[in-house]
Regions:
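Structured segments of extracytoplasmic/periplasmic soluble domains
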Residues: 112, 248-253, 262, 287, ...
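Solvent-exposed loop/turn segments at secondary-structure junctions
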Residues: 167-168, 229-233, 264-270, 303-307, ...
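Active-site segments of SGNH/GDSL-like serine hydrolases
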Residues: 300-305, 335-370
Length: 431
């Protein structure tokens, strides 16, 4: 989905992804590299308990709030709060420099139990090492895991990860929208549990792409939620995103399963820009297929491709055209084929209602495309199961609109009640 907000005020903008799809014979050609294999067990006993999809650095705007991705960091400490979906007795973090243009120098890293805000519970802070060293360098285009550290954790527990930078990083690899804040302090505050120096904050994650756990109940695989801002959680507060609610639902049923949010607000099937992530077929391998132990993926995509034809956005090419349902369906099929080649189940989420949004995205022609794609998702049998977001969100008297009780103030995205209703509709037996 394509609409961003800050937690300090309701500031919303239609965002999207630029770039033309590679088209041949009217169909988007979306080949995804995938070596046929079965879904692997978590590597070495490790399970990815939290993760984020990385993006190129892009300036913040009045609508989506400021971020530090363009300037980067120098002689600063950055503390980021995440919530695990599964616990264990050991923890490691993974850092990404996938969009970096120079080596990323990490002077230090630490992890501990979050005490709210930028605070960490005293006695829980553990310094991290990388191949036995306190500092490390992440090559451009690469990711790197820390050495494991002993830290008992539980499902749904929040951790604070602190990174120390002593040299200018330049523009950062990051995830733009979160419902958690990242905190910045000048100087070295790596292991301080409470510090007034963490006075600056933004709603983004920087370099941190994953947190893994080992030694717990033994996760029965990983579920990845993949797609646009509906997956990213725009319109929600706190930990009310689909991945969060699904983790809670699985934990309540005693099913140890990790759930990863690989959503990017504004993401599309047919085009990419720096603002809203690589197009879905391009990033599917990194954000879904290459994660350890993935057994199923929930996919919600297509709304931004439809909406981009009617909006004006500096990140989008002017004069966009409405895609055909066939183009979007072919994009979905490419993702399904790639998932199945790895033994991963694919659950298709129907596109949520677009009519009534505060942004000029709806038209009868756009509705026809949405209806055709949704009909295919529901009836083709190509997805292993269906999460019918459209019917969950629809107003019963006007199904092209969302029901007011489930919609955020932008008239499009779910509010917390809407996200909770979507989570209840997830077919757990298909995961």
């Amino acid at each position: 989905m394509t609409f961003e907000l800050t937690t300090r005020a309701i500031k919303i903008s239609l965002t999207g992804v630029a770039g033309a799809a590679l088209v041949c014979g009217g169909l988007a050609q979306t080949a995804i590299s995938s070596t046929p294999t079965s879904a692997s067990d978590p590597i070495g006993g490790w399970s990815e308990s939290w993760g984020a999809a990385m993006q190129r650095p892009t300036p913040g705007t009045e609508d989506n709030g400021p971020n530090w991705s363009m300037k980067g960091f120098a002689d600063q400490s950055v503390r980021q709060v995440i919530r695990l979906s599964e616990g264990g007795d050991r923890v490691r973090i993974r850092l990404s420099n996938v969009y970096g243009t120079k080596p990323l120098k990490i002077a230090g890293a630490a992890v501990g139990t979050s005490a709210g805000g930028a605070k960490v519970w005293p006695g829980t802070i553990k310094t991290l090492k990388f191949h036995g060293a306190a500092s490390t360098v992440v090559k451009p285009g690469a990711e790197l895991a820390s050495d494991p550290v002993a830290l008992p954790t539980k499902p749904l527990q929040k951790l604070a990860v602190t990174l120390r930078f002593t040299e200018p990083t330049g523009p950062t690899t990051f995830h733009r929208f979160t419902t958690q804040e990242a905190y910045r302090a000048s100087g070295d505050h790596l292991t301080e549990p409470v510090s007034a120096a963490f006075a600056k904050s933004t709603n983004s994650w920087y370099y941190l792409t994953g947190v893994d756990v080992a030694g717990g109940a033994g996760a029965q695989g990983t579920v990845v939620t993949f797609g646009d801002s509906l997956i990213d959680g725009v319109g929600s507060t706190g930990d009310e995103r689909i991945a969060d609610g699904l983790a809670e639902r699985l934990a309540a049923q005693g099913r140890p399963t990790t759930v990863i949010n690989a959503g990017i607000g504004g993401n599309r099937i047919l085009g990419d820009t720096a603002c809203y992530g690589d197009k879905a077929p391009t990033r599917f391998r990194r954000d879904v297929l290459d994660r350890p132990g993935v057994r199923s993926v929930i996919i919600h995509l297509g709304a931004n491709d439809i909406a981009a034809a009617k909006i004006e956005d500096p990140c989008l090419p002017k004069g966009g055209t409405l895609p055909t349902a066939r183009q979007l369906i072919e994009g979905h099929r490419a993702l399904i084929r790639a998932a199945h080649a790895r033994g991963i189940k694919a659950i298709g989420a129907t596109i949520l209602p677009l009519k009534g949004a505060l942004f000029p995205i709806w038209s009868p022609e756009a509705e026809k495309v949405r209806d055709e794609v949704n009909h295919w998702i529901r009836t083709s049998g190509e997805y292993d199961a269906v999460l019918d977001v459209d019917r969950v969100m629809a107003d019963r008297t006007d199904p092209d609109r969302p029901w007011l009780g489930y919609v955020f103030e932008d008239g499009l995205h779910p509010n917390d009640a809407g996200y909770q209703a979507i989570v209840r509709a997830v077919p757990l037996g298909a995961l």
